[in-house]
């Protein structure tokens, strides 16, 4: 059933539209989308991971301005076979920033707030995919002021989830600072924090699990299972990035603390991290703005080539929960035909300790064709 939180946010959005001084002649509409097609081939160890293909993302969006202060965005995801809302919000421009009312990304993690159109590897790291709240319904505010960036929000669950019982609320924030800020030379640091309540059910549960890098497989080799009697969950994150011409380095650590009843085994702590380096063989540089990375534009008509390497690890074992540990090394090659069309190749070697099916060491070859338009 739809929760009181969703109803309150929905009422606020409707009220906002009704009371805004709408002038239809001033409204603008921009339409765009993205298509990402993946293939993955696994060298299995213990678990059959099922090689295959998929539409990783297939999205259409409409966005624009209602007047000089108010704007909107609606983005739908079709890759799952059902139409899902990726983003759906009304925005209000504040001095140097924006307030978003609806479903949007929670301000947490450099890799998460960087669009999938611009991330260096086919998939974000396991720590980011497992712990970061991603898109939620709520009120999100962000502001960039010189070398500083701020983001904060209060939110419930994703609008595409059916929730029985009262939806757990969450708060979160991100602060980033770029002491070096030039077109092709950037040094970035950031801190993230979030506190989230579980949905108000009899069990009050959370669960953490991670794929072996590739999204094509639905199999998770590490999994805490359902953790019950949870009071709340705290997430902390540290992030850093450096760009100097064609060279780039980026790293994050995310820690999670589960506040749990003593009768269920007490509190739990899990964490994960990643670090990667990349190099543009053709001389391009990763563009940075508003504490996130953006679109790469090749310098010439022959396109741009980028090579990258990443190490990541995640630990889902603590106390009486044996979810397992996973370490992954990924090598990547990206070919940017132009600023809208990109081909990606990733090879990942995975090592799992104490996972769902014990210890194992699978690997994966992954390919992606990605295009976006607007």
PLM-predicted stretches and their roles:
Residues 26-199, 270-299, 306-319, 324:
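Outer membrane beta-barrel
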Residues 45-48, 92, 103, 193, ...:
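Outer-membrane beta-barrel pore domains
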Residues 7-8, 54, 131-132, 324-325, ...:
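Short hydrophobic/aromatic segments of transmembrane alpha-helices and their interfaces
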Residues 23-28, 359-361:
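Extreme N-terminus of proteins, especially the signal/transit-peptide cleavage junction
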Residues 1-11:
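Bacterial N-terminal signal peptides that target proteins for export
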